Amino acid sequence: MSKKDTEHDDDFALFKEAVQGVKKLRQDTIIQQPKKNTKQKEIKRSNREASDSEFYFSDEFVPRLNEEGPTRYARDDVSTYEVKRLRRGVYVPDVFLDMHGMTQQEAKRELGAMIAYCVKNEIHCACVQHGIGKHILKQKAPLWLAQHPDVMAFHQAPLEFGGDGALLVLLSIPEK
C-alpha cells in the first residue's frame, strides 16, 4: 500500500470516529412541492400557438382590396399617411417570412406564427415574401392578412425588400 492510500484510510477512520453516534435529522423546515406537470403546460402552449396560426385565415372571406395599382390595404382606423410611409420604405421590417415553395396550408400556418411572434416580441413591421410564381400565394397572402385583427395595414414592398414579390405589413401591438 502506498503512503497516499494509508493517509486516505486514516482520514476516513478519523471521520467515521468523529461522526459515530450521530443521528440523521428529520427534515421539518422545507415542505416539498409537488412536481409541476410540464407536459400539460407544453400541450396548452402548442394548442395556443396552433390556434394563433390558423384561427384567423379563411379562404372564403374576400375583403375589399384595391384592384388597381400595387397591392395595399389599411383598416378604417389607420391613416393614409401610414400606408404612404409603408410604400416609401420608411418602416424597416424586423422580421422576414419567405413563403417560396410553401403550400397554402403551410403558408397560412407560417403567416399566423409570424404575426403571433411579432405581437409577442412587439415588432411593428414585417416583410412577407410571397414570390411571383403562379400567383397563388401572391393572391392569397393579402386576403389572409386583411382578416387578421393585428394587421393595421400592408403595402407592396419597395424594391429593396422584394418589390412585386413581397408585402410590408404594419402590425398593431397591444399595450400591456
Swiss-Prot record:
SMART domains: SMR (SM00463). Its EC number is 3.1.-.-. Keywords: Endonuclease, Hydrolase, Nuclease, RNA-binding, rRNA-binding. Residues 29-51 are annotated as: Disordered. GO terms for biological process: rescue of stalled ribosome. Pfam families: Smr (PF01713). SUPFAM superfamilies: SMR domain-like. Acts as a ribosome collision sensor. Detects stalled/collided disomes (pairs of ribosomes where the leading ribosome is stalled and a second ribosome has collided with it) and endonucleolytically cleaves mRNA at the 5' boundary of the stalled ribosome. Stalled/collided disomes form a new interface (primarily via the 30S subunits) that binds SmrB. Cleaved mRNA becomes available for tmRNA ligation, leading to ribosomal subunit dissociation and rescue of stalled ribosomes. Belongs to the SmrB family. This is Ribosome rescue factor SmrB. It comes from Vibrio parahaemolyticus serotype O3:K6 (strain RIMD 2210633). The gene is smrB.
